[in-house]
């Protein structure tokens, strides 16, 4: 409920916008189906849960805390892990807020009610602080059981139905009450006034998800959906209403009822609302009408998705928002991020999200709730008033009043009823839909109605466009969307916003963010001065402070506000097209929020905005677009945006308002992010700087964008970049600002994805960022890409509605929705990567650094062009284009804050003129994708990692490189982002005029290419690269497919392939250097970069000669290859900056998503998920070739990507690989299209299989390495399939798909080696395979981390290599390769076969490699690869490409989140290299994959490779790669199998064999390893089994040395000995303490009861005095029972072993003793011991490795021993703290054995304390040393205190003879020195040693 409510809060603004009307019909259709019932019921249940302890618990912390703090904390919490709990609890809080809210009426008040401020609103029962409020709400809930139950129910249900459940209960009410209530009308009326307050808090959230706010504002049904959340709001209002019977009581009661029982509540609500409508209609209508208009527009933007959703049944919608159904466009948009991204994390997050948002509301509304109330009702009240309004009614009324909302409107019953309505908004989804649609048709008229209908809360719901973002999702699936939207969807939509923006927590956070921003901003002139809609939006934004916590909320708010003016302005001014209008409306909806946020932020950043003021208008729009996309576009925007865009009823005034609002939006965003995060501050600083710079650039619009970009590089820049920036901005925001803002990437499209990042950034920027980033973002990939698309669209619309309209027009409404989805997906990709890069706030800091660095680069490259760009953007068309470019530039800018300006300018220059000249649709679309791509690629990657500088350097240098070669155009592309942006700009700006039609395809390509060139683009360029990133982000996986599609389009020109070889070298060398230098020293690589830019042009050229031949890349055919190469180079560059690569990868992913979106917007089917795999690639290709197919194919892809996005959370499970493949094929167009699509399908499936698994791990555990693995796998799959033009090969994927779903994890593990092998084999089947595999390996190695390096060496090789070899090399540049392959496919047959073969085989190997790395990651091998950026960099350098490549891939996939992004590219490169040798086997790739599956040989090879990788990864990564390479070559040659299914078998067979061999290695011939460890001693290690080889030896040795050294220092007797052995001898296993070694073993003698066991030291039983349990059994190493199977044998063996090994033990003991006495002894002892032990272990047989304990404890053996007893490890008793501490922690303390012989078993059990404190006893590597000696001494040593034998703890004072039992020493008062585990007797404890 909170989620919903928060959405409502956002939607409060949005509800004010009549935009809801736009989506009304759709939402209604969507919601009416049965969603109402389901939703309501579910919401009821959820409401119960929400309002029950869980919600309160989750949120009470949030609400109880000061609003701001709570908001932040809650947001964080909800971001981190409480997403479920906190989200939901927050939602209940929200509901509570709503309950008190009506009294408070402004949504912000409601939000405030959430926080401490809420008590004022709940005058009747003001509780202290937020908790009081919460309790109050709880009480109110109690009073109003329905809402209480409903929300609590939602809380419980929400976990599995985060949004669906959350929303459903309200939704059920909705259908009942909505249909009859027709609340849409009231909501529309009230939407302006009443929804505002509601939207401000919960209603906004409500609207956000249902259609209430965004969709509801668009459609009353949507509004009602929001009101479902608003139902929560109603509870919030109920505290108000309770006190204010007439006003608040009605609304709250009804709302609560609505929440609880949709029909009754609905009816009552309707009646009340109607009554209220009559009363407040005029007042509310007046102010709220405007607001409602804007709100609704924003909501309509949100309603964008409803078209998609509308088709969905309630169940479908639920599914949409359920992990499985997160495919549904609306759901994907609105909910997918949460569900799709990380079903568990996000869903829980979303669940918590509502609660968290409540806290945000609380934080934003309590601290900024007033402001937010204002902002929500900012329509009416001033933020201060809202915040200050203690009186629920007065406060709400005042804020509303201040916002020109009549006081009585707030206090009025109608307002209250509106609040109730708001609470019912979820339940009103259908009615709200209708109303919103009607409102969309008649914005003002309906707006008035809505004003009346929707009380401030409702208004809040509508006004809360940010929440409306969730709304977007909700309207998308109004019926189903609405119920989930109500709470879950609202949460999801909002969370989607947040997901996209900040993760599942984001919805609430963003809601609060918006509220907070608006609230904090309200005071800011911008929010108030913006426009009433903006004010409303500001209300949503609430306050910059809150925004800091919930930047996304603020952002959404901003969106809501921004779109109002900007969007209506642009919509009305730009296009008449209904689609555009829909988009405009959707934008407007978000514009309101954006405006609010913008105002809030602008006020905050007014200083920065002073110069950017002129720009803000244009910028504001883009931010709004982003925001709107985030909110509206996420759920509704994607689906509904097309629809809202269609209704051109968006009033021009709104549009105009939007412009104004946009203005502030950027600055506000910019400013708020600084507030939100520490990094934001730097960004903020940068922002002003950037602002100054950008304004300097010359275009007002671009300037603000850049400014925004600077602060929130992507987001603000998105403002300036309009269409392009929405994605660029969110990505940057995500990476930089989002974390800085809480949810600031509030651009719901980008914002959602970024919101996840931002929210993560806020609360758990790092933890959640990885998780949300990987999980949410993957989710975002579905919703966010749509949102991103929408946002992109909207932003572009804001900048140039024409472009947006063009984009929208490009595809039908549905197509548009799909496009939005697709774009959103792409954006997601970028955002995801941004998320990844943003994973750590430090990353953001580094981003700042990098951005500054990038800034310089941008200035270098973009300065000249930037100014022109800015100038160009000045023109409406140019600005759009410019915006897009600027978005990219902004991304670049983001990398370097200073750069943003230049970058923005540069992109703007490129974009602006072309955009104006070119068809706006394509241009806009391209712009959208372009900015998405660059933003994703550059900003995310660059901004996220500490390597940001490198990443940016990579990106910037790449773009710079392209810029140099391309001249002005290339120059624009030079910066990574800038390059991507410029690439797009070049396409857009330069070629746009040339290739207007192909511009869109070109742009996607450009997006891909620039990104590839930049580095993240690598993933895009590489079919695999994108998937890699997708995997990395989870969403990127979706994006990956899209990315692949996008990247594929870039490869239309086979000539480019040939050309490609050289550019990669150039780019690789130059860019690599740049990356390495960490500066934007990409200028030298401008040529290479130019290639990437050209690829963008090339793809365009493929589509249309002009584009291909544009200045950017005159040589279209040859250039594409070049571009591809460039992309690869970037890819390589990425590896160099592993971290950056990771981010870039996500960015790339995003960018591909953008591209795919463009291409795939038409595909709206759920199957698009499959298509996403193949469709994006294929469609990318097709789009490149055919512009027209792009929309259709794009649409298909759009859905597919959504599905994929969903699969991020539940992608794999929902759709079997086979099914996906089939769907993919089905969705594939005609012959060529089908073929391509099929090819893509296969990769998509492969990728998806790998991707979902990887994505899931990432999402669940925030394991960047696994996600990177996924991206590589996905990249490979994509690359393979896309590379393989032949669809036949792609067929393999389906089988794998089917199996993959079940054995996804296994497949993932196996896929790496299998695919690698397959690819290698495919490539290696020919005689040239050995070399080819080496190349692929190298490529993978060099592609991401060593993209530059590898390219330097391999890239050169590529050009150097003759036809086939260069081709192989080209494939090595997989980034390019994916597109290149497509290009090849399209172009020359010879090239095509080669390219295809290379791509396919390589792709497969890439996939295999990616999966292998993942497996390694699981094994922990990733340490070498995942962690090793260096290894990644090494990869290219090492001449062990095969094995290295797998390692590298593993590294890139695992270790590099960046490598993830780069990993995708890198892996594909590897694939390319591997398959390169078999150019003609592009099609055989699939069969090969299958073959791989089939033959055990292949499996074994794969496994061997994996094993080597695993084993060598940590230590022998380089050596292992050598072996692996040969193996891989063999595998490649021998395994022409499909890697899809064989992977599983390979994994099982190889893994098992491998593991067994490792563990047993019986055939291994023993040898003595002589190592000179120290100058003093020679260490001999007897290696009796492979497991004991150096690696294991060294590990135990070092740990032993460490332990022994530490222990020896502490040990009195063997101190010197131990130290020496530890230092010199100990490093060798034999050099471990020379004392007897005991290993923790299994309990062999079960006859020994615990009661009869005594400590072998003190002879006391367990728990004697305070000694605790006995630890053990410890066996002498020679007597250690052989594992469990050999336990029985062990008794027998122990006899012989004991006989043989006891002497050895004694010998060792003697040696140890002598070592103690003699320094030289340790050496002898060491040598002797190893020999003796070796012999002993040999007799022992297989058990000996485990028994080799002291001498050569194998890692395996050690781990086994350690595993036997967790406490035994890592503790050493010796003199040193570590050893001693280890010992204490371990079992050492409890090693009590019957005695040394201890019967047959030789079991020794000891008390931990005894072992730890006994001198000479220490635990090393799980082995207990000196225990036997200590036992011998203890037998005769009487205790000084009790005089009993067994005393082992001696006074450490020199000469002191006191010895005690540990308990006696305790009793005696001895002093225990834990530092070295020594003891001082009472006599000496005060004396110095």
Swiss-Prot record:
Gene3D superfamilies: Zinc/RING finger domain, C3HC4 (zinc finger). Detected in all tissues examined with strong expression in the thymus and brain. Expressed in epithelial cells involved in organogenesis. No expression was seen in the corpus callosum of the brain. A motif (Nuclear localization signal) lies at residues 1143-1160, 1206-1223. Residues 933-943, 1146-1156 have a biased composition (Basic and acidic residues). There is a cross-link at residues 802, 884 (Glycyl lysine isopeptide (Lys-Gly) (interchain with G-Cter in SUMO1)). InterPro entries: EPHD (IPR034732), Trans_Reg/Chrom_Remod (IPR052440), Znf_PHD (IPR001965), Znf_RING/FYVE/PHD (IPR013083). This is Retinoic acid-induced protein 1. It comes from Mus musculus (Mouse). The gene is Rai1.
């Amino acid at each position: 409920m909170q989620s919903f409510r928060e959405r409502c809060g956002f939607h409060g603004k949005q509800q004010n916008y009549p935009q809801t009307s736009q989506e009304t019909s759709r939402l209604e259709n969507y919601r009416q189906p049965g969603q109402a019932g389901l939703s309501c019921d579910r919401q009821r249940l959820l409401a119960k849960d929400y309002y029950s302890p869980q919600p309160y618990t989750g949120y009470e912390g949030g609400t109880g805390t000061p609003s701001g703090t709570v908001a932040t904390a809650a947001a964080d919490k909800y971001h981190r892990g409480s997403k479920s709990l906190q989200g939901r609890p927050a939602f209940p809080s929200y509901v509570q807020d709503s309950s008190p809210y009506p009294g408070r009426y402004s949504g912000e008040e409601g939000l405030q009610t959430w926080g401490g401020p809420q008590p004022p609103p709940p005058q009747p029962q003001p509780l202290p602080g937020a908790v009081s409020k919460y309790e109050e709400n709880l009480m109110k809930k109690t009073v109003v059981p329905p809402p209480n139950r409903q929300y609590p129910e939602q809380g419980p249900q929400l976990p599995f139905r985060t949004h669906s459940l959350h929303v459903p209960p309200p939704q059920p009410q909705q259908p009942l009450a909505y249909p009859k209530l027709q609340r849409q009308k009231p909501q529309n009326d009230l939407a302006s006034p009443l929804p505002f307050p509601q939207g401000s808090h919960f209603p906004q959230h409500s609207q956000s998800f249902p259609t209430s706010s965004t969709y509801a504002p668009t459609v009353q049904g949507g509004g009602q959906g929001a009101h479902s959340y608003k139902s929560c709001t109603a509870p919030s209002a109920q505290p108000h209403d309770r006190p204010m019977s007439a006003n608040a009581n009605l609304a709250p009661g009804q709302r609560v009822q609505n929440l609880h029982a949709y029909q009754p509540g609905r009816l009552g609500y309707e009646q009340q609302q109607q009554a209220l409508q009559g009363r407040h209609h005029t007042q509310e209508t007046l102010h709220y009408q405007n607001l409602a208009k804007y709100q609704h527009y924003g909501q309509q933007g949100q309603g964008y998705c409803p078209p998609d959703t509308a088709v969905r049944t309630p169940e479908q919608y639920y599914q949409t928002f359920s992990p499985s159904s997160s495919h549904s466009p609306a759901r994907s948009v609105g909910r997918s991020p949460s569900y799709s991204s990380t079903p568990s994390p996000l869903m829980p997050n979303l669940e918590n999200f509502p609660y968290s948002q409540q806290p945000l509301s609380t934080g934003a509304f309590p601290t900024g709730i007033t402001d937010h109330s204002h902002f929500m009702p900012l329509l009416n009240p001033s933020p201060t008033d809202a915040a200050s309004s203690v009186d629920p009614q007065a406060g709400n009324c005042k804020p509303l009043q201040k916002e020109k909302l009549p006081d009585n409107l707030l206090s009025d019953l109608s307002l209250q009823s509106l609040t109730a309505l708001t609470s019912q908004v979820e339940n009103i989804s259908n009615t709200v839909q209708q109303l919103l649609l009607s409102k969309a048709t008649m914005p003002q008229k309906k707006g008035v109605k809505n004003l009346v209908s929707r009380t401030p809360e409702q208004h809040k719901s509508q006004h809360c466009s940010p929440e409306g973002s969730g709304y977007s999702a909700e309207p998308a699936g109004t019926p189903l969307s609405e119920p989930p939207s109500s709470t879950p969807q609202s949460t999801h939509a909002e969370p989607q916003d947040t997901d996209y923006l900040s993760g599942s927590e984001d919805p609430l956070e963003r809601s609060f963010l918006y509220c907070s921003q608006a609230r904090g901003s309200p005071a800011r002139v911008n929010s108030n001065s913006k426009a009433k809609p903006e004010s409303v939006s500001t209300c949503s934004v609430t306050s910059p402070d809150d925004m800091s916590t919930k930047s996304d909320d603020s952002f959404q708010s901003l969106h809501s506000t921004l779109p109002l003016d900007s969007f209506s302005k642009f919509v009305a001014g730009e296009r008449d097209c209904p689609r555009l209008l829909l988009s405009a409306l959707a934008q407007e909806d978000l514009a309101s929020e954006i405006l609010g946020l913008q105002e809030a932020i602008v006020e905050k950043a007014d200083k920065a905005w002073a110069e950017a003021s002129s720009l803000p208008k244009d910028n504001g729009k883009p931010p709004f677009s982003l925001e709107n996309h985030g909110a509206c576009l996420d759920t509704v925007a994607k689906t509904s945006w097309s629809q809202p865009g269609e209704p051109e009823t968006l009033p021009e005034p709104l549009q105009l308002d939007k412009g104004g609002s946009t203005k502030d939006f950027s600055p506000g965003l910019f400013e708020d992010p600084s507030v939100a995060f520490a990094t934001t501050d730097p960004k903020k600083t940068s922002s002003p700087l950037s602002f100054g710079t950008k304004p300097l650039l010359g275009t007002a619009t671009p300037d603000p964008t850049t400014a925004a970009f600077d602060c929130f590089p992507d987001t603000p820049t998105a403002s300036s970049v309009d269409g392009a920036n929405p994605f660029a901005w969110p990505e940057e925001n995500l990476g930089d600002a989002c974390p800085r803002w809480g949810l600031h990437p509030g651009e719901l499209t980008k914002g959602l994805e970024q919101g996840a990042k931002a929210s993560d950034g806020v609360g758990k920027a790092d933890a959640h960022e990885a998780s949300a980033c990987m999980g949410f973002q993957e989710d975002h990939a579905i919703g966010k890409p749509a949102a991103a698309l929408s946002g992109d669209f909207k932003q572009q619309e804001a900048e140039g509605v024409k472009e947006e309209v063009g984009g929208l027009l490009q595809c039908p409404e549905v197509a548009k929705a799909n496009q939005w989805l697709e774009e959103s997906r792409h954006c997601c990709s970028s955002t995801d990567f941004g998320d990844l890069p943003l994973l750590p706030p430090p990353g953001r800091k580094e981003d700042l650094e990098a951005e500054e660095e990038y800034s310089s680069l941008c200035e270098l490259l973009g300065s000249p062009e930037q100014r022109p760009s800015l100038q160009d953007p000045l023109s409406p068309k140019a600005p759009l284009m410019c915006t897009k470019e600027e978005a990219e530039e902004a991304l670049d800018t983001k990398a370097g804050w200073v750069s943003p300006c230049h970058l923005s300018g540069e992109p703007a220059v490129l974009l602006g003129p072309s955009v104006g000249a070119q068809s706006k649709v394509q241009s806009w679309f391209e712009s959208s994708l372009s900015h998405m791509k660059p933003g994703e690629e550059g900003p995310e990657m660059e901004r996220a990692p500490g390597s940001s500088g490198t990443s940016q350097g990579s990106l910037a240098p790449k773009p710079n490189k392209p810029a140099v070669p391309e001249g002005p155009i290339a120059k624009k592309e030079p910066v990574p982002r800038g390059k991507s942006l410029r690439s797009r700009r070049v396409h857009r700006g330069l070629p746009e005029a040339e290739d207007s039609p192909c511009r869109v395809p070109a742009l996607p390509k450009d997006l891909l290419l620039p990104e590839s060139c930049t580095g993240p683009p690598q993933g895009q360029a590489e079919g695999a690269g994108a998937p890699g990133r997708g995997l990395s982000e989870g969403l990127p996986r979706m994006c990956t497919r899209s990315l692949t599609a996008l990247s594929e389009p870039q490869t239309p020109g086979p000539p480019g392939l040939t050309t490609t070889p050289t550019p990669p070298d150039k780019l690789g060398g130059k860019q690599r250097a740049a990356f390495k230098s960490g500066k934007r020293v990409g200028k030298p690589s401008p040529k290479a970069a130019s290639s990437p830019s050209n690829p963008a042009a090339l793809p365009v050229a493929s589509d249309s000669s002009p584009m291909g031949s544009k200045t950017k890349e005159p040589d279209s055919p040859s250039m594409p290859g070049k571009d591809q190469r460039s992309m690869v180079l970037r890819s390589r560059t990425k590896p160099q900056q592993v971290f950056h690569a990771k981010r870039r990868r996500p960015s790339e992913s995003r960018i591909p998503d953008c591209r795919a979106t463009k291409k795939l917007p038409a595909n709206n089917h759920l199957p698009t998920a499959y298509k996403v795999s193949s469709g994006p690639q294929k469609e990318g290709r097709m789009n490149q070739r055919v512009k027209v197919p792009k929309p259709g194919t794009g649409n298909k892809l759009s859905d597919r990507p959504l599905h994929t996005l969903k699969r991020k959370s539940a992608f794999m499970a929902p759709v079997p690989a086979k099914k996906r493949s089939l769907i993919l094929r089905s969705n594939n167009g005609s012959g060529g299209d089908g073929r391509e699509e099929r090819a893509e399908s296969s990769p998509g499936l492969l990728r998806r299989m790998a991707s979902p698994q990887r994505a899931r791990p990432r999402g669940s555990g925030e394991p960047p390495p696994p996600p990177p693995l996924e991206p590589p796998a996905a990249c490979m799959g994509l690359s393979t399939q896309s590379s393989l033009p032949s669809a036949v090969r792609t067929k393999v994927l389906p089988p794998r798909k089917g199996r993959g779903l079940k054995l996804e994890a296994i497949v993932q593990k196996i896929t790496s080696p299998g695919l690698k092998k397959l690819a290698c084999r495919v490539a290696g089947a020919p005689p040239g395979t050995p070399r080819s595999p080496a190349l692929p390996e190298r490529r993978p190695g060099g592609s991401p981390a060593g993209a530059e390096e590898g390219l330097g060496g391999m890239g050169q090789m590529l050009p150097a290599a003759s036809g086939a070899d260069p081709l192989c090399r080209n494939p090595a540049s997989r980034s390019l390769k994916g597109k290149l392959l497509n290009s090849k496919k399209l172009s020359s047959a010879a090239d095509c076969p080669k390219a295809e073969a290379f791509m396919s085989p390589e792709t497969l190997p890439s996939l295999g490699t990616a999966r292998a790395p993942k497996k390694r990651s699981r094994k922990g091998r990733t340490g070498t690869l995942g962690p090793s950026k260096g290894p990644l960099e090494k990869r290219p350098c090492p001449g062990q490409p095969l094995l290295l490549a797998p390692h590298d891939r593993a590294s890139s996939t695992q270790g590099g989140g960046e490598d993830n992004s780069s990993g995708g590219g890198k892996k594909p490169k590897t694939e390319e290299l591997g398959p390169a040798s078999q150019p003609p086997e592009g099609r055989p790739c699939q069969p090969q994959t299958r073959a791989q599956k089939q033959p055990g040989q292949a499996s074994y090879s794969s496994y061997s490779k994996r094993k080597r990788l695993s084993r060598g990864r940590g230590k022998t990564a380089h050596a292992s790669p050598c072996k692996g390479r040969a193996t891989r070559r063999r595998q490649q040659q021998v395994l022409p199998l499909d890697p899809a299914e064989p992977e599983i078998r390979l994994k099982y067979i190889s893994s098992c064999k491998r593991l067994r061999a490792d563990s047993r290695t019986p055939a291994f011939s023993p040898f003595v390893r002589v190592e000179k460890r120290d100058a003093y001693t020679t260490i001999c290690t007897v290696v009796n089994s492979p497991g004991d080889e150096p690696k294991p030896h060294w590990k135990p040795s070092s740990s032993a040395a460490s332990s022994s050294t530490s222990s020896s220092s502490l040990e009195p007797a063997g101190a010197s000995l131990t130290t020496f052995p530890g230092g010199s001898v100990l490093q060798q296993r034999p050099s471990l303490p020379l004392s007897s070694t005991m290993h923790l073993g299994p309990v062999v003698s079960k006859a020994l009861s615990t009661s009869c066991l005594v400590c072998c030291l003190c002879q006391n039983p367990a728990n004697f005095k305070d000694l605790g349990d006995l630890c053990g059994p410890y066996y002498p190493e020679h007597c250690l029972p052989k594992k469990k199977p050999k336990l029985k044998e062990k008794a027998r063996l122990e006899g012989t072993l004991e006989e043989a090994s006891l002497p050895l033990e004694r010998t060792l003991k003697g040696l140890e003793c002598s070592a103690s006495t003699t320094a030289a002894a340790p050496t002898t002892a060491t040598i002797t011991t190893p020999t003796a032990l070796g012999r002993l272990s040999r007799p022992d047989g297989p058990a000996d490795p485990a028994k080799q304990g002291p001498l050569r404890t194998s890692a395996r053996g050690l781990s086994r021993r350690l595993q036997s007893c967790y406490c035994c490890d890592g503790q050493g008793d010796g003199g040193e703290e570590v050893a001693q501490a280890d010992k204490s922690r371990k079992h050492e303390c409890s090693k009590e054995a019957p005695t040394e012989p201890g019967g047959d078993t030789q079991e020794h059990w000891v008390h931990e304390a005894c072992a730890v404190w006994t001198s000479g006893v220490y635990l090393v590597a799980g082995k207990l040393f000196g225990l036997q000696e200590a036992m011998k001494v203890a037998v005769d040593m009487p205790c000084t205190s009790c005089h009993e034998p067994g005393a082992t703890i001696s006074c450490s004072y020199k000469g002191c003879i006191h010895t005690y039992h540990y308990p006696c020493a305790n009793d005696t008062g001895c002093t225990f020195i834990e530092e070295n585990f020594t003891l001082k007797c009472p006599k000496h404890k005060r004396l110095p040693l």
